[in-house]
Design a protein with these regions (language model features):
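Acidic/histidine-rich catalytic neighborhood
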Residues: 122, 126-180
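Short, solvent-exposed turn/loop segments enriched in Gly/Ser/Thr/Pro and often Arg
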Residues: 1-5, 46, 58-63, 135, ...
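Short, structured secondary-structure elements
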Residues: 1-24, 59
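Acidic/His metal-coordination segments adjacent to aromatic residues that form catalytic metal sites
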Residues: 3-14, 68-88, 145-163
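Active-site core of glycosidic bond-cleaving carbohydrate-active enzymes
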Residues: 19-59, 67, 75, 85, ...
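An acidic- and aromatic-residue-enriched active-site/binding cleft used to recognize and process polar
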Residues: 1-6, 10, 101, 108, ...
């Protein structure tokens, strides 16, 4: 959040990497502005997180693959921290891997894709175990799930199932893993499982204001002016 250039011994937010939009947003311009060579530090962080995040996925959720929550640091922590409105966000790792896929799309570097495929696959594989069937539907959703720092109908926060942001990050992670496996000609069985899960992700919902719903239920507050715009991912 603060980087190395700040004037505080104890920087705001501990100067950690906030990966529920902040870190990603800082790197969004890299490929499109032909500055892809600036992403190496980000890739190093992702590689480290795929290790600590595999332990978190296994021990906290009983899931394969790897994941990270909303915040990490120089020790590459992957577990939840702080309050539920921030911490119960299981998509930080998967969101970061979109930068790996974007690099391939911009460069066509198949050697790069092969090198990073295990990390891309691992982030998607987590969702195969983590996403659960929503009662009364054929959908599978993330649960627990939060829309970071947001809550329905103006409430401070709500831990729920299948926030739109979660579903779309899962869709992106699974889709890039499927496409990468097709390009590399590997993991056909896992690819089919991921394709099946993609078909069960809920479609985005349109609410009474004509808005893209933040949750599966129509509970958006049109007067919400909170600065956290992670949901802009969708």
């Amino acid at each position: 959040m603060q980087g190395v250039w700040n004037d505080s011994k104890n920087a705001p937010w501990d100067s950690k990497y906030t990966i529920n939009i902040n870190t990603e947003m800082n790197y969004w311009p890299a490929e499109v502005t032909n500055l892809g060579n600036t992403t190496e530090p980000l890739y190093s962080l992702i590689k480290d997180l795929s290790g600590t995040g595999a332990q978190t996925a296994r021990e906290m959720y009983g899931c394969r693959g790897w994941m990270a929550h909303h915040n990490t640091d120089i020790w590459r922590i992957a577990g939840p921290v702080d309050g539920a409105q921030w911490g119960m966000f299981p998509n930080g790792g998967a969101w970061l891997t979109t930068h790996l896929w974007q690099h391939y799309l911009y460069t066509g570097d198949k050697a790069f894709l092969k090198q990073w495929y295990p990390v891309i696959k691992g982030a998607a594989e987590f969702y195969l175990d983590y996403m659960q069937k929503l009662p009364g539907t054929e959908w599978k959703v993330t649960v627990p799930s939060v829309s970071p720092e947001q809550g329905p109908k103006g409430k401070k926060t709500a831990v729920t199932a299948g926030c739109t942001m979660d579903n779309q990050i899962a869709f992106d992670a699974l889709t890039s893993a499927v496409k990468a496996s097709e390009i590399l000609g590997v993991d056909e069985a896992e690819r089919k499982a991921m394709q099946q899960l993609i078909s069960q992700i809920p479609p985005m919902q349109i609410g009474k204001y004509g808005q893209l719903q933040e949750w599966l239920v129509d509970a958006d507050d049109p007067k919400n002016e909170h600065r956290q715009i992670g949901r802009a991912h969708v």
